């Protein structure tokens, strides 16, 4: 028998200041899975500021801790016994991958060619621990079945949304990202890859 419990709570407060409107949203997601018996608290918070000097701009910052519970293929751990025989074991000690995230963003609302547009830009950083490494053999992906690595991702996303062609919503976007990982037991001295 396998079961999961999940709960989520969120609240938003807003107020007016001399410098504009401020929205504060805080929440908590809580997950539990009987297979791993792991309790995963995920707090998150965001602050949005709409400055009084220019209503066309919105600035925001968001942060939180996020978990990704393992899928079945990730739980599979290949073990070799003393006779050289391989067997598959489902690792119930495998922890959910965890990321600490920070996002800074801004929106700008404007008109061009008589139509409304929105420009959005976000910069983000994510630190990920308890990662599970994998190998790729052609189209086959084999997971290690262990929390044996850590990593990070940083990036920038920019997007213009609106009616570039009259009557049709469309967007132009640009994204740049750098992500790296390293093994916790770096016996081959690979470093960040």
For the regions a language model picked out, list residue spans one by one.
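Residues that define the transmembrane beta-barrel architecture of outer-membrane proteins
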Residues: 3-5, 39-41, 98-102, 150-154, ...
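Gram-negative outer-membrane beta-barrel transporters
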Residues: 14-19, 124-127, 144-193
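Outer-membrane beta-barrel translocator domains and adjoining extracellular loop/strand segments
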Residues: 1, 36-42, 72-78, 85-87, ...
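Repeated loop/turn-to-beta-strand initiation elements of outer-membrane beta-barrel proteins
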Residues: 17-24, 54-59, 112-119, 167-170
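Surface-exposed extracellular loop regions of Gram-negative outer-membrane beta-barrel proteins
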Residues: 2-34, 40-48, 160-162, 166-178
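Outer-membrane beta-barrel translocator/channel fold
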Residues: 52-102, 108-109
């Amino acid at each position: 028998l396998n079961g999961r419990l999940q709960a989520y709570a969120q609240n938003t407060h807003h107020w007016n200041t001399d410098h504009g409107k401020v929205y504060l949203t805080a929440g908590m997601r809580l997950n539990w899975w009987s297979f791993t018996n792991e309790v995963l608290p995920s707090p998150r918070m965001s602050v949005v500021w709409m400055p009084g000097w220019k209503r066309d701009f919105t600035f925001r910052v968001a942060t939180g801790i996020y978990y990704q519970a393992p899928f079945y293929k990730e739980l599979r751990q290949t073990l070799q016994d003393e006779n050289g025989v391989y067997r598959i074991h489902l690792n119930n000690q495998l922890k959910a991958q965890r990321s600490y995230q920070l996002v800074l963003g801004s929106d700008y609302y404007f008109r061009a060619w008589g139509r409304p547009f929105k420009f959005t830009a976000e910069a983000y950083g994510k630190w990920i621990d308890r990662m599970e490494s994998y190998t790729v053999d052609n189209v086959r992906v084999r997971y290690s079945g262990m929390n044996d690595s850590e990593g990070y991702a940083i990036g920038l996303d920019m997007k213009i949304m609106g009616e570039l062609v009259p009557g049709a919503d469309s967007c132009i976007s640009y994204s740049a990202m750098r992500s790296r990982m390293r093994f916790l037991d770096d016996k081959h001295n690979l470093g960040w890859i």
